[in-house]
């Protein structure tokens, strides 16, 4: 099969890039092996201006424009201490559940340069997929397929968020609990509440005790501590490993070889970074 662009990775970065390229008129397919621990799993896709203002207007304005055009950006009012703040939001279910771009749910085993672009070999499939361009947006696993000096600094940070079923908050909130960390709670759907505490732990140090501490902090923030919600199956833990690259902002977008792109490293600003990267790919892949 031949196409214009193959996007490896169907998390936030890959999904947003694939949809933007498809809407720009390119033929796009995705590949994702549904690996446990993907960084997008706990994502809420909240974008508070103070979190991303250091990107600069030249990056966050094109990002917000693209995200609003292809998904619709909503504004949510949060209580922040004694003040209120408006936070931009895209529904992660809409991004990750979009079906405009077909996705092969298989593992990539090799990327091979061809005379007309790139061949992507898939596990258990004899014929490779072929495209003029390949974007590898595989989070912390991007370096398994792409070599780049910048990817040498790629590390993962584990964290968890929680979704309470059959519940709504009267007041959506952002509350600091430690330097550079905040507990955030909001109504992510008409029947669910999302709460996260910003934990960012080395994956090898993550364990059930860490998750229990995070759960306790989140449950206390919404006055659900001691109600037995976990035992009753009323709350779901969403674990993921976010990709970080020190000194790279807002993320890594690099054409490592002609037609082969590495895209990762969004850290805690994944959605706004993904929007910028997608706008750049639309501009640079013809």
Curated annotation (Swiss-Prot):
Classification via InterPro entries: FAD-dep_OxRdtase, FAD/NAD-bd_sf
Domain of life according to the entry: Viruses
GO biological process, one term: symbiont-mediated suppression of host innate immune response
One Pfam short name: DAO
GO molecular function: lyase activity
Function of the protein: Catalyzes the cleavage of the N-Calpha bond of glycine in Nalpha-GlyT to produce 5-aminomethyl-2'-deoxyuridine (5-NmdU) on DNA as a step in the pathway leading to thymidine hypermodifications in the viral genome. As a final result of the pathway of hypermodification, 5-acetylaminomethyl-2'-deoxyuridine (5-AcNmdU) substitutes for a subset of thymidines in the viral DNA. These modifications probably prevent degradation of viral genome by the host restriction-modification antiviral defense system.
Protein name: Flavin-dependent lyase
